[in-house]
A protein has these predicted regions:
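Conserved N-terminal subdomain of the carbohydrate kinase-like
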Residues: 47-135, 139
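Glycine-rich phosphate/adenosyl-contacting loop at the front of the ribokinase-like
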Residues: 1-71, 115
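Charged helix-capping and loop-helix junction motifs
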Residues: 117, 143-146
Length: 146
């Protein structure tokens, strides 16, 4: 059987979650990343290539995200790099059992994901299946949502 390619398109964000000792744990998450993560867990690499399509910066946090994806079997070959941007960030705080989220994503490279239509189209042309969410479309400028 020929290997299939599954693409998840969107914004992976850095996540800061408060720990009991007052420090914060750094992780990476987001709806489209979570989908890629579980697709990788549910399929065999020889049967399905799972790749993430996004844009990141060239800063250390973006490099850490790329390393995380690679280490967990999520392909990065379709990830664009934007030199003057970084990745989005959110903070999770707890008030009792209630979680609240604070976002910093205005300088997220993923907002520019569709700026170069040719690069995005070339990435998508490799797919047998593509996943994106409403959030993926919402972070793009109105001109690039089509």
């Amino acid at each position: 059987m020929k290997q299939k390619t599954f693409l998840s398109v969107g914004e992976c964000m850095a996540e800061l979650q408060a720990r009991d000792d007052g420090l914060y744990r750094l992780g990476f998450a987001g709806d489209t990343l979570n989908t890629a993560w579980y697709m990788r867990a549910l399929t065999r690499p020889q049967d399905v290539a799972v790749d993430y399509v996004t844009a990141v910066g060239t800063d250390p946090l973006s490099a850490k995200m790329l390393a995380f994806l690679k280490a967990n079997g999520v392909g990065t070959r379709f990830i664009q790099e934007v030199s003057d941007r970084t990745v989005g960030l959110y903070l999770i705080t707890l008030a009792g059992a209630e979680r609240s989220f604070t976002y910093w994503r205005s300088s997220s490279a993923a907002r520019l994901l569709a700026e170069n239509r040719e690069v995005l189209a070339a990435s998508l042309s490799h797919a047998d299946a593509i996943y994106f969410s409403g959030i993926t479309l919402a972070i793009l400028s109105p001109a690039h949502r089509r």
